[in-house]
């Protein structure tokens, strides 16, 4: 049990990541610039290419928040392990919450389906993607 206790701060930051991501999406959707953008599009349908921009925005926001949480974990807890278990513990709350709330959507026949799938992918694997890139960069710097 003591082995898993050292990953509790990562789980706590993962819960904070889930709260931050849902809060930021709620703010952007209700009073932000995306609301104004989507409101100004005439004949908005599932085949509108504006959904590709929305998908890029949502995925970028999720990856930015994931990177912020990983870097804050490194700064706040320098003595705790920074490994794949940490990344999984940090990813788990957001990934499970998004899968529970939105479900799995792989309808890639229109732009709306592509946007949902890309957002789901970045929410379910964002921390793991950023952590993998950090590990790869660390290995390259160690070899040089």
Role assignments for model-derived ranges:
Residues 15-65:
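Hydrophobic transmembrane helix segments
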Residues 19-27, 94-140:
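Alpha-helical membrane-associated segments of multi-pass integral membrane proteins
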Residues 22-34, 69-77, 81, 131-139:
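Membrane-water interface at transmembrane helix exits
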């Amino acid at each position: 049990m003591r082995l898993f206790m050292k990953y509790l701060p990562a789980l706590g930051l993962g819960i904070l990541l889930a709260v931050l991501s849902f809060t930021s999406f709620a703010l952007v959707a209700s009073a932000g610039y995306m609301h104004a953008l989507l409101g100004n599009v005439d004949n908005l349908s599932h085949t509108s290419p504006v959904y590709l921009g929305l998908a890029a925005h949502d995925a970028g926001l999720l990856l930015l928040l994931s990177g912020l949480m990983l870097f804050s974990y490194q700064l706040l807890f320098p003595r705790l392990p920074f490994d794949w278990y940490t990344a999984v513990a940090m990813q788990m709350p957001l990934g499970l919450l998004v899968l529970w709330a939105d479900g799995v959507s792989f309808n890639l026949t229109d732009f709306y389906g592509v946007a949902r799938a890309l957002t789901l992918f970045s929410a379910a694997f964002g921390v793991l993607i950023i952590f993998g890139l950090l590990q790869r960069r660390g290995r390259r710097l160690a070899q040089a």
